[in-house]
Swiss-Prot record:
Residues 1-34 form the signal peptide. Involved in the biosynthesis of osmoregulated periplasmic glucans (OPGs). The gene is opgG. It is found in: Periplasm. It comes from Shewanella sp. (strain W3-18-1). This is Glucans biosynthesis protein G. The lineage of its organism: Bacteria, Pseudomonadati, Pseudomonadota, Gammaproteobacteria, Alteromonadales.
Length: 544
C-alpha cells in the first residue's frame, strides 16, 4: 500500500494514523528493477528547454557509527550499550533545503541507478540499492558493508542515483548519507533480481515471499502505541550488511536502534523463499523503564470486508492488507480474530504465557474477493511471528484505528511483556518471521475461512446483528456435526445454527446478537467434535 498521508483530519486519533504511516517505506519502483525502456515515439517530440539546475550548498556530516574498521558479532551490541549509557541526543545532520522540501513527485524522480547496485558484477545471490534522503525521509542513516572481520563505510555518492526529469536541483557531492536501502534477490525468476526486503523510515522494514506484492510492514520496536501522550518511534540509525557468500541463500543485516527511551542491537538473518524467513535477535538497553513496549510489532491496513463495511461506498467487496490476527497460545489453542475498522479507537489484549506464535494474516487469497486489478490485495503477504525461547507472561496486543482511506495503516499488533523492562538492564529476545503464506494447516485441522455480518431483521433496521462464520476442514469431513458454543460478554445470543457447507468442505455457523444497548461486546465461538481435533476458536469484538 502507498503510505502517503493527507494528515489533515481533526479527529483525535488522526495523529496516530499519520505517525504510523509516515514511517512506512515507500515502494518507489516495481518489484523487478529491470532498466526502463521508453516506447518508440510515432510523432516528433516537442522541443523542451531543460530546467535550470541549481547547485546545492555544501553539506558537512560526520560518520558516527559505521566507521571503516574491525567488526565482529558483538560490535553493534557494544555500540548500543555505550549509546544507552549516555542521555539521548537528537542528531542534527544537515540536509540541503531543496532536498528537505521535495514534493512526492520530486522525490520519486531520484532513482537508484540499477547498474550501480552493490555486488551487481560479483555473481552473488543478493544485490543492494540505497534510498536517497529527502521528502519525509530526512534522517541520515549510515550503512557499512561487512566482509570478513572488516566493516567499510558506504559513503554517499551522487553517481549512484539518476534524477532530472522533475527535480530542478543537482544532487549533493558531499556525504549526506542515505535514508535506507533495499535488498534484491532472484526471488521469483532466475536472472531477474526482484525486491526482497526494504529498510526505510524509523525502524520500519518489510519483506516479500515468492509471488507477493508489498503490503504490511514490521518495526524493530513499538513504544507507547495508542498512548494519549503520543507514540515514540525508535529509529535504526545505522546498518552493517554482511557480504553474502556465492553459494548461500542467506544475507545478514545488523542494525543499531535508538530513541529517547532505549537503544538496541538487532541482527536479521534473511532467507528468501516461498515464505521468506527472517530470524531476529535483539538486545535492548533501556534508558528508562519500558512499561509500554511492544516486541515484534507489525503494522497493516484494514478498510472493509464482509464482516463490517460501515456504509462504505466502494466497488470492491474487500480492501485490506491483512484480514485477521492468528494466535497459537501457550495453552495449545488456535485463535482467529477477524480485523475491523471501528468507529472509535480499539485496543484488545489477549493474555498468554509462553506464546507459540502470532501474526497478521491475509487469509483471503482470491481475486474475486477484492476485484482490484492494481492493488492486488490477494498477493499481500502474511507475517507470522514465532518466538524463540520462552517469552513468559504477557499479551498479544491488537490496536485498530478508524480510517476512511486505504492509504492509512490503521492496524498494529505486537507482544507486550507483563513486567516492565527496567532502566539500565539488558533485555534479550529472539523470534522468527515468515513473510508469505500463513502457517501450514495440518491434516484434519478446522480453520475459519470467512466471517460476515449484517442486520438480522429483514423487515426493518434494528440493532440486532446476524453473524455468519464459515469453517473449512483440511481433510475428510467428519461423519457427525460438531456442537457450536457461542458466548458473549453482553447482550443476548440466539438462533445458533451449525450446518454442513459443501461449498468449502466445512461448516457454517450462524447466530444472532441482540446488543441490548451495549456499545462493545466480546464474542467467542467454538466447535466441539465427538472425536477431538484441532479447531480454531473464533473471537470478535463487536462495536457500534
Amino acid at each position: 500500500m502507498v503510505s502517503l498521508l493527507r494528515c489533515q483530519s481533526s479527529k483525535p486519533y488522526s495523529s496516530l494514523i499519520c505517525s504510523l504511516a509516515l514511517g512506512v517505506a515507500f515502494a518507489l519502483s516495481g518489484t523487478a528493477y529491470a532498466e526502463e525502456t521508453k516506447p518508440t515515439e510515432t510523432v516528433p517530440a516537442p522541443v523542451v528547454t531543460p530546467p535550470k539546475v541549481t547547485p546545492p550548498p555544501a553539506t558537512k556530516n560526520q560518520v558516527r557509527f559505521t566507521k571503516t574498521g574491525a567488526f565482529d558479532s558483538d560490535y553493534v551490541v557494544k555500540l548500543a550499550r555505550k549509546l544507552a549509557a549516555k542521555p539521548y541526543s537528537v542528531l542534527k545532520d544537515p540536509l540541503p533545503v531543496g532536498l528537505a522540501k521535495l514534493t512526492y513527485d520530486e522525490y520519486r524522480d531520484i532513482r537508484f541507478n540499477p547498474t550501480a547496485s552493490i555486488w551487481r558484477d560479483q555473481g552473488l545471490p543478493f544485490q543492494m540499492q540505497m534510498f536517497h534522503r529527502g521528502f519525509y525521509f530526512q534522517d541520515l542513516i549510515e550503512i557499512a558493508i561487512v566482509e570478513g572481520n572488516k566493516a567499510t563505510h558506504l559513503a554517499y555518492e551522487p553517481k549512484y542515483f539518476t534524477a532530472g526529469e522533475v527535480i530542478t536541483q543537482a544532487l549533493p557531492n558531499d556525504d549526506i548519507g542515505y535514508s535506507g536501502f533495499r535488498i534484491h534477490n532472484q526471488l521469483n525468476n532466475n536472472g531477474v533480481f526482484d525486491e526482497l526486503m526494504v529498510f526505510q523510515g524509523a525502524s520500519y522494514f518489510r519483506a516479500l515471499g515468492k509471488g507477493n506484492a508489498y503490503g504490511l510492514s514490521a518495526r524493530g520496536l513499538a513504544l507507547k502505541t495508542a498512548d494519549p501522550e503520543g507514540e515514540e518511534f525508535p529509529i535504526f540509525r545505522a546498518f552493517w550488511v554482511e557480504r553474502p557468500h556465492y553459494d548461500s541463500n542467506l544475507i545478514v543485516v545488523h542494525a543499531l536502534l535508538d530513541s529517547p527511551s532505549v537503544a538496541g542491537a538487532y541482527r536479521f538473518s534473511v532467507r528468501p523463499g516461498d515464505n521468506t524467513q527472517i530470524d531476529v535477535e535483539a538486545t535492548l538497553f533501556p534508558r528508562v523503564e519500558l512499561s509500554k513496549v511492544g516486541l515484534a510489532p507489525s503494522t497493516s491496513m484494514f478498510l472493509h470486508s464482509l464482516n463490517g463495511r460501515h456504509d462504505t461506498d466502494d466497488f470492491r467487496p474487500e480492501v485490506h492488507d491483512s484480514d485477521g490476527l492468528l494466535m497459537f497460545n501457550g495453552r495449545g489453542e488456535h485463535l482467529w480474530r477477524p480485523l475491523a475498522n471501528p468507529r472509535q479507537l480499539q485496543v484488545s489484549a489477549f493474555s498468554d504465557n509462553s506464546p507459540q506464535g502470532f501474526g497478521l494474516i491475509q487469509r483471503e487469497r482470491s481475486y474475486a474477493a477484492y476485484q482490484d486489478l492494481e492493488a492486488q490485495y490477494e498477493r499481500r503477504p502474511s507475517l507470522w511471528i514465532e518466538p524463540v525461547g520462552n517469552w513468559g507472561q504477557g499479551a498479544v496486543v491488537l490496536t485498530e484505528i478508524p480510517t476512511e482511506s486505504e492509504i492509512h495503516d490503521n492496524i498494529v499488533s505486537f507482544w507486550k511483556p507483563r513486567q516492565p523492562i527496567p532502566a539500565g538492564s539488558e533485555y534479550h529476545f529472539a523470534y522468527r518471521m515468515s513473510w508469505g503464506e500463513e502457517p501450514a494447516v495440518k491434516h484434519n485441522y478446522v480453520v475459519v475461512s470467512r466471517t460476515a455480518s449484517g442486520r438480522a431483521d429483514i423487515a426493518k433496521p434494528t440493532p440486532r446483528r446476524l453473524f455468519v462464520v464459515d469453517y473449512q476442514v483440511n481433510g475428510a469431513m467428519p461423519e457427525e456435526l460438531p456442537l457450536a458454543k457461542v458466548e458473549a460478554s453482553g447482550g443476548i445470543i440466539s438462533n445458533v445454527v451449525i450446518a454442513p457447507n459443501a461449498a468449502n468442505n466445512g461448516y457454517r455457523l450462524a447466530f444472532e446478537l441482540e446488543p441490548e444497548g451495549k456499545e462493545l461486546i466480546e464474542l467467542r465461538a467454538e466447535l466441539k467434535f465427538p472425536t477431538p481435533r484441532q479447531v480454531e476458536t473464533w473471537l470478535y469484538r463487536w462495536t457500534l
